[in-house]
Amino acid sequence: MNISTIDGRLIVEGAQILPGTFRNFSGAPDQFNPGGGKRYFHFVIDDPEVAQQMRNDGWNVKIKPAREEGDIPFCYLKVAVAFPNFQKNPKARPLDIAMFKSNGVNRLDETTVGLLDGAYITQANITIRPYCWDQADPSKKAAYVQELHAFVQESAHFASDYDEFEENPFND
């Protein structure tokens, strides 16, 4: 994984997006979001020095402690997925979210991004824009996705057998 900064944005290449309760692209109600509507995901920061530098820069990097002996603690960052309201702001920049599979690419929008909740994401490239949520302390940043290219491994063993069919149930 490689993390760099361009114009205040984080560029993350080869990220590991955490599965299960660490992602909620659909915005469904859950333990931490009982009313629903909040979309998010978390990715691992595999270099402790990079994680510390991000913390120093104001990013809200968390540490997941080891639960059992032999487990390794890891650092991660929560990233919000907020689609723009074009009625309120017609000049807003749309999000670029795409799911790359062996048979091509699917662009995802507000209605389809939930497909990533259950997908086996092997890696992702992410552009994250900061939002300074504390006006008194502009170093405190929340992370919002601007671009997400998720590389997905299909789970259906026979899916490639049906690529030639026009109405392929495995091609979204």
Q: Which sequence ranges carry the predicted segments?
A:
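Short glycine-rich beta-strand segments
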Residues: 80-86, 129-133, 151
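OB-fold ssDNA-binding interfaces and closely related basic DNA-contact patches used
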Residues: 1-90
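Beta-strand/loop nucleic-acid-binding surfaces
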Residues: 79-111
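Acidic, gly/ser/pro-rich intrinsically disordered tails
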Residues: 1-10, 154-172
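OB-fold/S1-family single-stranded nucleic acid-binding modules
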Residues: 129, 136-156
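Residues that cap or initiate secondary-structure elements
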Residues: 47-49, 134, 154
